[in-house]
Swiss-Prot record:
Disruption phenotype: Cells lacking this gene exhibit a lack of cytochromes c but normal contents of cytochrome a and b. Can sporulate. It is a multi-pass membrane protein. Required for the biogenesis of c-type cytochromes. This is Cytochrome c biogenesis protein ResB. GO terms for cellular component: plasma membrane.
Protein backbone atom coordinates (compact mmCIF):
# COMPACT_ATOMS: atom_id res chain seq x y z
CA UNK A 1 0.00 0.00 0.00
CA UNK A 2 1.34 3.45 -0.94
CA UNK A 3 1.98 5.99 1.83
CA UNK A 4 2.36 9.76 2.02
CA UNK A 5 4.99 11.39 4.24
CA UNK A 6 4.14 14.74 5.78
CA UNK A 7 6.62 17.58 6.40
CA UNK A 8 6.39 16.77 10.12
CA UNK A 9 7.76 13.29 9.37
CA UNK A 10 4.54 11.36 10.02
CA UNK A 11 3.68 8.69 7.42
CA UNK A 12 0.03 8.73 6.34
CA UNK A 13 -1.97 6.24 4.23
CA UNK A 14 -2.55 7.30 0.63
CA UNK A 15 -5.71 9.38 0.29
CA UNK A 16 -5.26 11.18 3.62
CA UNK A 17 -6.52 14.78 3.42
CA UNK A 18 -5.07 16.09 6.71
CA UNK A 19 -1.91 14.73 8.33
CA UNK A 20 -2.90 12.47 11.21
CA UNK A 21 -0.24 14.00 13.46
CA UNK A 22 0.00 17.73 12.75
CA UNK A 23 -3.13 18.33 10.67
CA UNK A 24 -1.26 19.91 7.73
CA UNK A 25 -3.17 19.70 4.41
CA UNK A 26 -1.76 17.01 2.11
CA UNK A 27 -3.74 17.97 -0.99
CA UNK A 28 -3.29 21.08 -3.10
CA UNK A 29 -6.90 22.24 -3.26
CA UNK A 30 -8.56 22.71 0.13
CA UNK A 31 -11.76 24.50 1.22
CA UNK A 32 -11.49 27.52 3.56
CA UNK A 33 -12.45 25.36 6.56
CA UNK A 34 -10.96 21.93 7.26
CA UNK A 35 -13.22 18.94 6.66
CA UNK A 36 -13.18 17.37 10.11
CA UNK A 37 -15.96 14.82 9.60
CA UNK A 38 -13.47 11.96 9.69
CA UNK A 39 -10.51 14.15 10.71
CA UNK A 40 -9.27 14.12 7.12
CA UNK A 41 -8.48 10.40 7.28
CA UNK A 42 -8.13 8.21 4.19
CA UNK A 43 -11.25 6.16 3.45
CA UNK A 44 -10.84 3.09 1.29
CA UNK A 45 -13.95 3.89 -0.75
CA UNK A 46 -12.52 7.31 -1.66
CA UNK A 47 -9.11 5.96 -2.60
CA UNK A 48 -9.40 2.70 -4.57
CA UNK A 49 -11.67 1.90 -7.51
CA UNK A 50 -9.83 -0.60 -9.70
CA UNK A 51 -10.70 -4.19 -8.85
CA UNK A 52 -14.14 -5.80 -8.59
CA UNK A 53 -13.65 -5.95 -4.81
CA UNK A 54 -13.04 -2.19 -4.78
CA UNK A 55 -16.24 -1.58 -6.75
CA UNK A 56 -18.33 -3.83 -4.48
CA UNK A 57 -16.81 -2.14 -1.42
CA UNK A 58 -17.49 1.32 -2.82
CA UNK A 59 -21.08 0.38 -3.69
CA UNK A 60 -21.98 -0.86 -0.22
CA UNK A 61 -19.99 1.87 1.56
CA UNK A 62 -22.31 4.51 0.11
CA UNK A 63 -24.80 5.91 2.62
CA UNK A 64 -27.23 6.58 -0.24
CA UNK A 65 -27.16 2.90 -1.22
CA UNK A 66 -27.82 1.91 2.39
CA UNK A 67 -30.77 4.31 2.63
CA UNK A 68 -32.26 3.02 -0.63
CA UNK A 69 -31.91 -0.57 0.55
CA UNK A 70 -33.80 0.34 3.73
CA UNK A 71 -36.50 2.20 1.75
CA UNK A 72 -36.98 -0.74 -0.66
CA UNK A 73 -37.15 -3.21 2.25
CA UNK A 74 -39.70 -1.05 4.08
CA UNK A 75 -41.81 -0.73 0.92
CA UNK A 76 -41.69 -4.50 0.37
CA UNK A 77 -42.57 -5.11 4.02
CA UNK A 78 -45.56 -2.78 3.73
CA UNK A 79 -46.69 -4.51 0.53
CA UNK A 80 -46.63 -7.82 2.37
CA UNK A 81 -49.30 -6.54 4.77
CA UNK A 82 -51.91 -5.72 2.10
CA UNK A 83 -53.33 -9.25 2.35
CA UNK A 84 -52.76 -11.87 5.07
CA UNK A 85 -49.62 -13.94 4.75
CA UNK A 86 -50.02 -17.65 4.04
CA UNK A 87 -49.29 -18.56 7.67
CA UNK A 88 -52.36 -16.60 8.79
CA UNK A 89 -54.92 -17.98 6.36
CA UNK A 90 -57.95 -19.77 7.84
CA UNK A 91 -57.26 -23.41 8.79
CA UNK A 92 -57.41 -25.67 5.75
CA UNK A 93 -57.44 -22.81 3.23
CA UNK A 94 -55.38 -23.43 0.09
CA UNK A 95 -53.27 -20.42 -0.86
CA UNK A 96 -53.50 -21.10 -4.62
CA UNK A 97 -57.30 -20.63 -4.55
CA UNK A 98 -57.89 -18.54 -1.42
CA UNK A 99 -56.35 -15.28 -2.64
CA UNK A 100 -58.22 -15.33 -5.94
CA UNK A 101 -61.56 -16.21 -4.33
CA UNK A 102 -61.25 -13.60 -1.59
CA UNK A 103 -59.48 -10.74 -3.36
CA UNK A 104 -60.06 -11.32 -7.07
CA UNK A 105 -57.50 -10.73 -9.81
CA UNK A 106 -55.26 -8.60 -7.61
CA UNK A 107 -55.23 -11.38 -5.01
CA UNK A 108 -54.26 -13.93 -7.65
CA UNK A 109 -51.43 -11.66 -8.84
CA UNK A 110 -50.38 -11.22 -5.21
CA UNK A 111 -50.09 -15.01 -4.92
CA UNK A 112 -48.36 -15.55 -8.28
CA UNK A 113 -45.69 -12.96 -7.42
CA UNK A 114 -44.98 -14.79 -4.18
CA UNK A 115 -46.06 -11.98 -1.84
CA UNK A 116 -48.16 -14.48 0.15
CA UNK A 117 -44.90 -15.80 1.60
CA UNK A 118 -42.95 -12.56 1.39
CA UNK A 119 -41.00 -12.52 4.66
CA UNK A 120 -39.49 -15.93 4.00
CA UNK A 121 -38.76 -15.37 0.30
CA UNK A 122 -35.19 -15.51 -0.96
CA UNK A 123 -35.21 -11.96 -2.34
CA UNK A 124 -36.54 -10.46 0.92
CA UNK A 125 -33.84 -12.26 2.91
CA UNK A 126 -31.33 -11.00 0.32
CA UNK A 127 -32.50 -7.43 1.00
CA UNK A 128 -32.05 -7.95 4.75
CA UNK A 129 -28.59 -9.43 4.16
CA UNK A 130 -27.69 -6.51 1.86
CA UNK A 131 -28.61 -4.02 4.58
CA UNK A 132 -26.38 -5.95 6.98
CA UNK A 133 -23.49 -5.97 4.47
CA UNK A 134 -23.97 -2.24 3.87
CA UNK A 135 -23.84 -1.54 7.61
CA UNK A 136 -20.65 -3.59 8.03
CA UNK A 137 -18.83 -2.02 5.08
CA UNK A 138 -20.05 1.52 5.88
CA UNK A 139 -18.80 1.15 9.43
CA UNK A 140 -15.41 -0.38 8.54
CA UNK A 141 -14.86 2.21 5.80
CA UNK A 142 -15.19 5.01 8.33
CA UNK A 143 -14.41 3.78 11.83
CA UNK A 144 -10.93 2.36 11.15
CA UNK A 145 -9.54 5.54 9.52
CA UNK A 146 -11.23 7.70 12.17
CA UNK A 147 -9.79 5.60 14.99
CA UNK A 148 -6.33 5.80 13.43
CA UNK A 149 -6.59 9.58 12.99
CA UNK A 150 -7.75 10.22 16.56
CA UNK A 151 -5.17 7.84 18.00
CA UNK A 152 -2.30 9.47 16.09
CA UNK A 153 -3.36 13.10 16.52
CA UNK A 154 -0.54 15.23 17.84
CA UNK A 155 -0.74 17.86 20.55
CA UNK A 156 1.24 20.44 18.60
CA UNK A 157 -0.72 21.09 15.43
CA UNK A 158 0.20 22.99 12.30
CA UNK A 159 -0.80 26.71 12.44
CA UNK A 160 -2.51 26.24 9.07
CA UNK A 161 -4.66 23.47 10.57
CA UNK A 162 -5.69 25.67 13.50
CA UNK A 163 -6.52 28.64 11.24
CA UNK A 164 -8.88 26.41 9.21
CA UNK A 165 -10.93 25.36 12.23
CA UNK A 166 -14.45 26.73 12.54
CA UNK A 167 -13.71 28.36 15.92
CA UNK A 168 -10.41 30.22 15.82
CA UNK A 169 -8.70 33.26 17.30
CA UNK A 170 -5.14 34.58 17.41
CA UNK A 171 -3.84 36.93 20.10
CA UNK A 172 -0.49 38.67 19.93
CA UNK A 173 0.76 37.99 23.43
CA UNK A 174 2.91 35.66 25.45
CA UNK A 175 1.06 33.12 27.59
CA UNK A 176 2.75 33.17 30.99
CA UNK A 177 2.81 30.22 33.35
CA UNK A 178 0.15 31.60 35.69
CA UNK A 179 -2.39 32.21 32.90
CA UNK A 180 -1.64 28.85 31.38
CA UNK A 181 -2.11 27.10 34.73
CA UNK A 182 -5.43 28.88 35.23
CA UNK A 183 -6.65 27.79 31.77
CA UNK A 184 -5.63 24.19 32.47
CA UNK A 185 -7.47 24.28 35.82
CA UNK A 186 -10.64 25.57 34.17
CA UNK A 187 -10.36 22.94 31.43
CA UNK A 188 -10.12 20.19 34.03
CA UNK A 189 -13.12 21.70 35.81
CA UNK A 190 -15.03 21.16 32.58
CA UNK A 191 -13.78 17.53 32.56
CA UNK A 192 -11.37 17.91 29.64
CA UNK A 193 -8.40 15.56 29.35
CA UNK A 194 -5.23 17.61 29.00
CA UNK A 195 -2.15 16.82 26.91
CA UNK A 196 0.79 19.23 26.68
CA UNK A 197 3.82 19.38 24.44
CA UNK A 198 6.33 22.17 23.82
CA UNK A 199 4.01 24.84 25.21
CA UNK A 200 0.95 23.67 23.25
CA UNK A 201 -2.18 22.24 24.83
CA UNK A 202 -4.73 19.77 23.50
CA UNK A 203 -7.87 19.53 25.66
CA UNK A 204 -10.30 16.79 24.68
CA UNK A 205 -13.46 15.21 26.10
CA UNK A 206 -16.29 12.98 24.92
CA UNK A 207 -14.25 11.13 22.28
CA UNK A 208 -16.27 7.97 23.00
CA UNK A 209 -19.34 9.70 21.53
CA UNK A 210 -17.72 9.45 18.08
CA UNK A 211 -18.16 5.68 18.29
CA UNK A 212 -21.92 5.99 18.97
CA UNK A 213 -23.03 5.53 15.33
CA UNK A 214 -20.79 2.48 14.95
CA UNK A 215 -22.06 0.91 18.18
CA UNK A 216 -25.48 1.66 16.73
CA UNK A 217 -24.54 -0.22 13.56
CA UNK A 218 -23.26 -3.21 15.56
CA UNK A 219 -26.62 -3.40 17.34
CA UNK A 220 -28.49 -3.25 14.03
CA UNK A 221 -26.29 -5.96 12.52
CA UNK A 222 -26.89 -8.26 15.51
CA UNK A 223 -30.62 -7.50 15.29
CA UNK A 224 -30.67 -8.37 11.56
CA UNK A 225 -28.78 -11.60 12.27
CA UNK A 226 -31.43 -12.45 14.87
CA UNK A 227 -34.19 -11.74 12.36
CA UNK A 228 -32.56 -13.98 9.74
CA UNK A 229 -31.96 -16.75 12.29
CA UNK A 230 -35.74 -17.14 12.46
CA UNK A 231 -35.58 -18.84 9.09
CA UNK A 232 -33.04 -21.41 10.30
CA UNK A 233 -34.86 -24.70 11.06
CA UNK A 234 -35.32 -25.25 14.77
CA UNK A 235 -34.68 -21.64 15.76
CA UNK A 236 -38.23 -20.31 15.38
CA UNK A 237 -41.61 -22.03 15.34
CA UNK A 238 -45.04 -20.41 15.04
CA UNK A 239 -47.56 -23.07 14.06
CA UNK A 240 -51.27 -23.71 14.52
CA UNK A 241 -52.56 -26.97 16.00
CA UNK A 242 -56.20 -28.07 15.97
CA UNK A 243 -57.06 -31.09 18.12
CA UNK A 244 -60.48 -32.69 18.59
CA UNK A 245 -61.64 -33.91 21.96
CA UNK A 246 -60.27 -37.34 22.78
CA UNK A 247 -57.70 -37.23 19.99
CA UNK A 248 -53.91 -37.07 20.04
CA UNK A 249 -51.91 -35.09 17.50
CA UNK A 250 -48.22 -34.53 16.81
CA UNK A 251 -47.09 -31.08 17.86
CA UNK A 252 -45.79 -29.24 14.77
CA UNK A 253 -42.21 -28.04 14.91
CA UNK A 254 -41.06 -30.84 17.23
CA UNK A 255 -40.17 -33.26 14.40
CA UNK A 256 -42.59 -35.84 15.76
CA UNK A 257 -40.93 -35.85 19.18
CA UNK A 258 -43.90 -34.53 21.17
CA UNK A 259 -47.63 -35.25 21.00
CA UNK A 260 -50.62 -33.55 22.62
CA UNK A 261 -53.90 -35.17 23.63
CA UNK A 262 -57.08 -33.14 24.06
CA UNK A 263 -58.80 -34.88 26.97
CA UNK A 264 -61.57 -32.31 27.15
CA UNK A 265 -62.32 -28.81 25.94
CA UNK A 266 -64.58 -26.53 27.97
CA UNK A 267 -65.97 -23.03 27.52
CA UNK A 268 -67.31 -20.72 30.23
CA UNK A 269 -69.41 -17.75 29.11
CA UNK A 270 -70.61 -14.55 30.75
CA UNK A 271 -74.15 -14.53 32.15
CA UNK A 272 -75.97 -11.28 32.90
CA UNK A 273 -77.61 -12.78 35.99
CA UNK A 274 -74.36 -13.70 37.69
CA UNK A 275 -72.21 -10.74 36.64
CA UNK A 276 -72.14 -7.24 38.10
CA UNK A 277 -74.74 -4.78 36.82
CA UNK A 278 -72.10 -2.67 35.10
CA UNK A 279 -71.37 -5.68 32.85
CA UNK A 280 -74.93 -7.01 32.70
CA UNK A 281 -76.16 -4.32 30.29
CA UNK A 282 -73.31 -5.00 27.88
CA UNK A 283 -73.92 -8.76 28.09
CA UNK A 284 -77.63 -8.26 27.38
CA UNK A 285 -76.79 -6.28 24.25
CA UNK A 286 -74.58 -9.06 22.93
CA UNK A 287 -76.66 -11.91 24.32
CA UNK A 288 -76.30 -14.29 27.24
CA UNK A 289 -73.81 -17.07 26.65
CA UNK A 290 -72.23 -15.47 23.60
CA UNK A 291 -69.14 -13.90 25.17
CA UNK A 292 -66.46 -16.34 26.32
CA UNK A 293 -65.22 -15.81 29.86
CA UNK A 294 -62.76 -18.66 29.81
CA UNK A 295 -61.96 -21.49 27.44
CA UNK A 296 -59.40 -24.15 28.15
CA UNK A 297 -57.99 -27.46 27.03
CA UNK A 298 -57.38 -30.27 29.48
CA UNK A 299 -54.24 -31.53 27.77
CA UNK A 300 -51.78 -34.37 28.18
CA UNK A 301 -48.26 -33.98 26.80
CA UNK A 302 -46.55 -37.11 25.48
CA UNK A 303 -43.01 -37.78 24.28
CA UNK A 304 -42.18 -40.33 21.62
CA UNK A 305 -40.03 -43.24 22.70
CA UNK A 306 -37.39 -44.49 20.29
CA UNK A 307 -36.80 -43.48 16.71
CA UNK A 308 -39.45 -42.59 14.17
CA UNK A 309 -40.61 -45.55 12.11
CA UNK A 310 -42.88 -44.35 9.33
CA UNK A 311 -46.15 -46.22 9.12
CA UNK A 312 -45.83 -47.52 12.67
CA UNK A 313 -47.89 -46.17 15.54
CA UNK A 314 -45.55 -44.28 17.90
CA UNK A 315 -44.92 -45.39 21.47
CA UNK A 316 -45.70 -42.46 23.73
CA UNK A 317 -44.56 -41.69 27.24
CA UNK A 318 -46.60 -39.30 29.35
CA UNK A 319 -44.67 -36.14 30.28
CA UNK A 320 -47.24 -33.96 32.02
CA UNK A 321 -50.93 -33.17 32.27
CA UNK A 322 -51.98 -29.52 32.38
CA UNK A 323 -54.85 -27.16 31.61
CA UNK A 324 -54.07 -24.74 28.79
CA UNK A 325 -55.87 -21.41 29.19
CA UNK A 326 -55.61 -18.05 27.46
CA UNK A 327 -52.30 -16.46 28.53
CA UNK A 328 -51.47 -19.58 30.55
CA UNK A 329 -49.56 -21.73 28.05
CA UNK A 330 -48.13 -25.19 28.39
CA UNK A 331 -44.33 -24.84 28.38
CA UNK A 332 -41.80 -27.57 27.61
CA UNK A 333 -38.38 -27.87 25.99
CA UNK A 334 -38.28 -24.23 24.71
CA UNK A 335 -41.82 -24.61 23.32
CA UNK A 336 -44.98 -22.83 24.47
CA UNK A 337 -48.48 -24.00 23.53
CA UNK A 338 -51.06 -21.20 23.74
CA UNK A 339 -54.85 -21.40 23.79
CA UNK A 340 -56.04 -19.08 21.02
CA UNK A 341 -59.26 -20.40 19.46
CA UNK A 342 -61.93 -23.09 19.48
CA UNK A 343 -64.78 -24.53 17.46
CA UNK A 344 -67.80 -26.09 19.12
CA UNK A 345 -69.98 -28.91 17.81
CA UNK A 346 -67.93 -29.71 14.74
CA UNK A 347 -68.93 -32.66 12.56
CA UNK A 348 -67.09 -35.78 13.62
CA UNK A 349 -69.09 -38.84 12.48
CA UNK A 350 -72.17 -39.41 10.32
CA UNK A 351 -74.49 -42.38 10.73
CA UNK A 352 -76.57 -43.78 7.84
CA UNK A 353 -79.17 -46.55 7.58
CA UNK A 354 -79.24 -48.76 4.48
CA UNK A 355 -82.93 -49.22 3.62
CA UNK A 356 -85.17 -50.53 0.86
CA UNK A 357 -86.83 -47.50 -0.68
CA UNK A 358 -90.23 -49.18 -1.02
CA UNK A 359 -90.50 -51.31 2.12
CA UNK A 360 -88.35 -49.00 4.32
CA UNK A 361 -86.71 -52.13 5.70
CA UNK A 362 -83.30 -51.51 7.26
CA UNK A 363 -80.36 -53.77 6.46
CA UNK A 364 -77.96 -52.21 8.95
CA UNK A 365 -76.23 -48.96 9.77
CA UNK A 366 -72.78 -47.56 9.12
CA UNK A 367 -70.92 -44.93 11.11
CA UNK A 368 -68.47 -42.92 9.02
CA UNK A 369 -65.50 -41.18 10.62
CA UNK A 370 -65.40 -37.93 8.65
CA UNK A 371 -61.70 -37.41 9.27
CA UNK A 372 -60.59 -40.90 8.29
CA UNK A 373 -63.40 -42.86 6.58
CA UNK A 374 -63.03 -46.54 5.70
CA UNK A 375 -63.25 -47.48 2.06
CA UNK A 376 -65.71 -50.36 2.65
CA UNK A 377 -68.40 -50.94 5.30
CA UNK A 378 -69.60 -54.55 5.54
CA UNK A 379 -73.15 -54.74 6.95
CA UNK A 380 -73.33 -58.57 6.78
CA UNK A 381 -75.54 -60.95 4.82
CA UNK A 382 -74.10 -59.76 1.52
CA UNK A 383 -74.83 -56.09 2.13
CA UNK A 384 -71.94 -53.66 2.05
CA UNK A 385 -71.27 -50.03 1.16
CA UNK A 386 -68.20 -48.78 -0.68
CA UNK A 387 -67.10 -45.14 -0.60
CA UNK A 388 -66.09 -44.44 -4.17
CA UNK A 389 -65.35 -40.77 -3.48
CA UNK A 390 -65.30 -38.50 -0.43
CA UNK A 391 -65.44 -34.70 -0.51
CA UNK A 392 -65.01 -33.29 3.03
CA UNK A 393 -65.85 -29.67 2.12
CA UNK A 394 -68.09 -30.12 -0.91
CA UNK A 395 -68.74 -27.42 -3.52
CA UNK A 396 -69.02 -27.11 -7.30
CA UNK A 397 -65.89 -25.67 -8.92
CA UNK A 398 -65.71 -23.32 -11.93
CA UNK A 399 -66.21 -26.25 -14.30
CA UNK A 400 -69.39 -27.27 -12.49
CA UNK A 401 -67.78 -30.42 -11.12
CA UNK A 402 -67.96 -31.59 -7.49
CA UNK A 403 -64.82 -30.71 -5.56
CA UNK A 404 -63.65 -29.94 -2.03
CA UNK A 405 -62.36 -26.65 -0.68
CA UNK A 406 -60.45 -28.10 2.26
CA UNK A 407 -59.82 -31.39 4.05
CA UNK A 408 -61.97 -30.28 6.99
CA UNK A 409 -65.47 -31.88 7.03
CA UNK A 410 -67.46 -28.65 6.92
CA UNK A 411 -69.84 -29.90 4.23
CA UNK A 412 -69.20 -33.63 3.65
CA UNK A 413 -70.42 -35.39 0.52
CA UNK A 414 -70.00 -38.99 -0.63
CA UNK A 415 -70.26 -41.11 -3.73
CA UNK A 416 -71.48 -44.50 -2.45
CA UNK A 417 -71.61 -47.84 -4.24
CA UNK A 418 -74.31 -49.93 -2.54
CA UNK A 419 -73.73 -53.68 -3.03
CA UNK A 420 -76.55 -56.12 -2.17
CA UNK A 421 -77.29 -59.81 -2.92
CA UNK A 422 -79.64 -58.81 -5.74
CA UNK A 423 -77.42 -55.97 -6.96
CA UNK A 424 -73.92 -57.49 -6.95
CA UNK A 425 -72.50 -54.78 -9.24
CA UNK A 426 -73.87 -52.13 -6.91
CA UNK A 427 -75.91 -48.96 -7.23
CA UNK A 428 -74.22 -45.56 -7.34
CA UNK A 429 -75.56 -42.79 -5.14
CA UNK A 430 -74.28 -39.27 -4.44
CA UNK A 431 -75.14 -38.19 -0.89
CA UNK A 432 -74.56 -34.75 0.62
CA UNK A 433 -76.27 -32.84 3.41
CA UNK A 434 -79.96 -32.51 2.42
CA UNK A 435 -79.18 -33.78 -1.08
CA UNK A 436 -79.17 -37.24 -2.70
CA UNK A 437 -78.58 -37.95 -6.39
CA UNK A 438 -78.96 -41.52 -7.67
CA UNK A 439 -76.71 -42.77 -10.42
CA UNK A 440 -79.41 -44.59 -12.43
CA UNK A 441 -82.26 -42.41 -11.23
CA UNK A 442 -84.20 -45.48 -10.06
CA UNK A 443 -82.17 -47.18 -7.32
CA UNK A 444 -83.79 -49.86 -5.16
CA UNK A 445 -81.73 -49.06 -2.06
CA UNK A 446 -80.70 -45.85 -0.45
CA UNK A 447 -78.67 -44.62 2.49
CA UNK A 448 -80.92 -42.75 4.85
CA UNK A 449 -79.32 -40.15 7.10
CA UNK A 450 -79.73 -41.12 10.76
CA UNK A 451 -77.75 -38.65 12.89
CA UNK A 452 -74.40 -36.93 13.35
CA UNK A 453 -71.95 -36.95 16.21
CA UNK A 454 -70.01 -33.77 16.97
CA UNK A 455 -66.92 -32.84 18.90
CA UNK A 456 -65.39 -29.64 20.16
CA UNK A 457 -62.07 -28.64 18.61
CA UNK A 458 -59.41 -26.65 20.41
CA UNK A 459 -57.23 -24.18 18.50
CA UNK A 460 -53.69 -23.91 19.81
CA UNK A 461 -50.61 -21.99 18.74
CA UNK A 462 -47.22 -23.66 19.10
CA UNK A 463 -44.36 -21.24 19.56
CA UNK A 464 -40.62 -21.54 19.97
CA UNK A 465 -38.23 -18.62 19.64
CA UNK A 466 -34.51 -19.07 20.28
CA UNK A 467 -33.74 -15.74 18.62
CA UNK A 468 -35.29 -13.46 21.22
CA UNK A 469 -32.07 -13.04 23.19
CA UNK A 470 -30.20 -12.15 19.98
CA UNK A 471 -32.85 -9.54 19.12
CA UNK A 472 -32.76 -8.22 22.70
CA UNK A 473 -28.95 -7.94 22.71
CA UNK A 474 -29.00 -6.22 19.32
CA UNK A 475 -31.74 -3.82 20.43
CA UNK A 476 -29.92 -3.00 23.68
CA UNK A 477 -26.62 -2.31 21.87
CA UNK A 478 -28.50 -0.20 19.33
CA UNK A 479 -30.01 1.95 22.11
CA UNK A 480 -26.62 2.28 23.82
CA UNK A 481 -25.21 3.58 20.53
CA UNK A 482 -28.10 6.02 20.12
CA UNK A 483 -27.62 7.40 23.65
CA UNK A 484 -23.83 7.45 23.27
CA UNK A 485 -23.95 9.47 20.06
CA UNK A 486 -26.92 11.68 20.95
CA UNK A 487 -26.22 12.92 24.48
CA UNK A 488 -22.45 13.45 24.36
CA UNK A 489 -20.22 15.44 22.03
CA UNK A 490 -16.58 15.11 21.09
CA UNK A 491 -15.02 18.48 21.90
CA UNK A 492 -11.42 19.53 21.30
CA UNK A 493 -9.65 22.77 22.17
CA UNK A 494 -6.13 23.64 20.95
CA UNK A 495 -3.86 26.32 22.42
CA UNK A 496 -0.71 26.93 20.41
CA UNK A 497 2.03 29.45 21.24
CA UNK A 498 4.38 30.48 18.44
CA UNK A 499 6.31 33.62 17.44
CA UNK A 500 4.83 35.85 20.15
CA UNK A 501 1.22 34.87 19.43
CA UNK A 502 -1.27 32.46 20.96
CA UNK A 503 -3.71 30.66 18.70
CA UNK A 504 -6.90 29.13 20.12
CA UNK A 505 -9.05 26.76 18.04
CA UNK A 506 -11.96 24.51 18.83
CA UNK A 507 -13.89 21.72 17.16
CA UNK A 508 -16.87 19.55 18.05
CA UNK A 509 -18.92 17.05 16.09
CA UNK A 510 -22.15 18.79 17.23
CA UNK A 511 -23.54 21.38 19.66
CA UNK A 512 -21.27 24.26 18.72
CA UNK A 513 -23.12 26.52 21.12
CA UNK A 514 -21.96 24.33 24.02
CA UNK A 515 -18.34 24.48 22.85
CA UNK A 516 -18.55 28.28 22.54
CA UNK A 517 -19.78 28.46 26.15
CA UNK A 518 -16.85 26.29 27.28
CA UNK A 519 -14.38 28.56 25.48
CA UNK A 520 -15.96 31.69 26.96
CA UNK A 521 -15.69 30.18 30.45
CA UNK A 522 -12.11 29.01 30.01
CA UNK A 523 -10.73 32.18 28.38
CA UNK A 524 -12.44 34.64 30.73
CA UNK A 525 -9.85 37.01 32.30
CA UNK A 526 -7.06 35.22 30.43
CA UNK A 527 -6.26 38.09 28.11
CA UNK A 528 -6.80 35.84 25.08
CA UNK A 529 -9.29 36.69 22.35
CA UNK A 530 -12.36 34.48 22.33
CA UNK A 531 -12.54 32.41 19.10
CA UNK A 532 -14.97 33.56 16.43
CA UNK A 533 -17.19 31.34 14.29
CA UNK A 534 -15.50 31.47 10.88
CA UNK A 535 -18.38 29.64 9.22
CA UNK A 536 -20.70 32.50 10.14
CA UNK A 537 -18.13 35.02 8.87
CA UNK A 538 -17.96 33.25 5.49
CA UNK A 539 -21.76 33.34 5.24
CA UNK A 540 -21.90 37.10 5.95
CA UNK A 541 -19.16 37.77 3.40
CA UNK A 542 -21.20 36.03 0.71
Amino acid sequence: MKQVKCECGHINPVGTVLCESCGRALQETQPPLADMRYDGSARRSQTYNKTIIDKIWNFFSSVKVGIWLIVITLAASAFGTIFPQEAYLPPGAQADTYYKEQYGTFGQLYYLLGFHHLYGSWWYLLLIASIGISLVICSLDRVIPLYRALKNQGVRRSPAFLRRQRLFSETVTVLNGESKEKIVTLLKKKHYRIREKEGSILAEKGRFSRWGPYVNHIGLIIFLIGAMLRFVPGMYVDETLWVREGETAAIPGTDGKYYLKNNQFSVETYNSKTEKKVFADAIDRVGDGRVAKNFQTDAVLYKREGKIVYGEKPKLEKVTEEDIRVNQPLRFDSFSVYQVDYKENQLDQMVFQLIDKKTKKSFGSLKINLLDPDSVYDLGNGYKVEIASYLPDFYFNQDGEPSTKTKIPNNPAFVFNIITPDKPKGEKSFVAIQETIEGSGNNKYKLKFDHVETKNITGLTVRKDLTLWVLAVGGAIFMIGVIQGMYWQHRRIWLHSQDGAVMVAGHTNKNWFGLKKDLAFILADSGLTEPVDQKELIKTQK
